[in-house]
């Protein structure tokens, strides 16, 4: 049954100066991973409940889509609207893909939901000084594009949509960037875990929230023959996807080195959080979210100790 009732957003999380007061700046990296991003949502909600603030977040794909609620300080919003609408045929799935060319509906998932049905708090988002950056992939060059979002308006929402537009099952999103019109797809193709980029931005403390457990290694994409045909007009994206497992695993190696050296604090799933591209069972989303909450609580003391060093 379709639910057309407008949803009144829950109160936002208060900013907590007692947790924020520290000498060094903090940058956080949020990996994507589709609905494994519910894990990230759980971690971030725990942080907000504790009143933790950081100076910058960079999100990729689902990390951008769900991480924006940290800047708007909306505890529980990401898991709430996904559980509410995951069974709605207007939200996502094969029917939406065949009708629109996008796995997730632009008009419903990126317009009706944030503007009317579970309202995104643009006032808090725009007034919060925390830097929020999303990563997209430039279809023409294959290079990552890093875009700071300030207002949370529909243009910002489209940048989030671009960051989460999975190749093959999404159309490129056209947006203006530095005076040029770009065609953009999922940032995970060009820079899946932008720890190196965040380190280059000058933040003294680095934190990464991953969506795969320790020891995970990405394997070559088995569907490359299909992907090559589907993306024959996007050769740079095809090249990225062909070598994505190698770049991703190299990033994991870099993360392990930074973590061992004490230069990076990593939160990763304590158990497997496998998730298909589309989940229609609200309980599956809740289960992944709860793993994130448990890990967020379990690591919170160590996180504060790292930030205080």
Predicted regions and their residues:
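Patatin-like phospholipase
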Residues: 1-60, 68-309
């Amino acid at each position: 049954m379709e639910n057309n009732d407008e949803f009144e957003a829950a109160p936002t999380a208060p900013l907590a100066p007692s947790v924020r007061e520290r000498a060094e700046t903090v940058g956080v990296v949020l990996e994507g991973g589709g609905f494994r991003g519910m894990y990230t949502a759980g971690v971030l909600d725990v942080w907000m409940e504790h009143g933790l603030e950081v100076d910058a977040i960079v999100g990729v794909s689902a990390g951008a889509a769900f991480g924006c609620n940290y800047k708007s300080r909306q505890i529980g919003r990401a898991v709430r609207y996904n559980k509410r609408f995951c069974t709605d045929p207007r939200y996502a799935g094969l029917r939406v893909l065949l009708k629109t060319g996008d796995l997730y509906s632009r008009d419903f998932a990126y317009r009706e939901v944030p503007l009317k049905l579970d309202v995104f708090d643009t006032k808090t988002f725009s007034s919060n000084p925390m830097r929020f950056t999303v990563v997209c992939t430039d279809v023409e060059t294959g290079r990552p594009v890093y875009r700071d979002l300030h207002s949370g308006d529909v243009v910002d929402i489209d940048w989030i949509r671009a960051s989460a537009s999975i190749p093959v099952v999404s159309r490129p999103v056209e947006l203006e960037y530095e005076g040029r019109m770009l065609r953009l797809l999922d940032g995970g193709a060009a820079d899946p875990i932008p720890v190196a980029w965040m380190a280059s931005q000058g933040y003294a403390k680095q934190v990464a929230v991953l969506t795969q457990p320790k020891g995970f290694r990405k394997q070559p994409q088995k569907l490359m023959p299909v992907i090559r045909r589907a993306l024959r007009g996007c050769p740079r994206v095809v090249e990225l996807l062909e070598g994505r497992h190698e770049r991703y695993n190299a990033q994991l190696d870099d993360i392990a080195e930074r973590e061992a050296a004490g230069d990076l604090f990593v939160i990763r799933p304590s158990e497997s959080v496998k998730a298909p591209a589309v989940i229609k069972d609200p309980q599956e989303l809740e289960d992944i979210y709860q793993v994130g909450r448990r890990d967020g609580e379990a690591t919170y003391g160590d996180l504060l100790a790292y930030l205080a060093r």
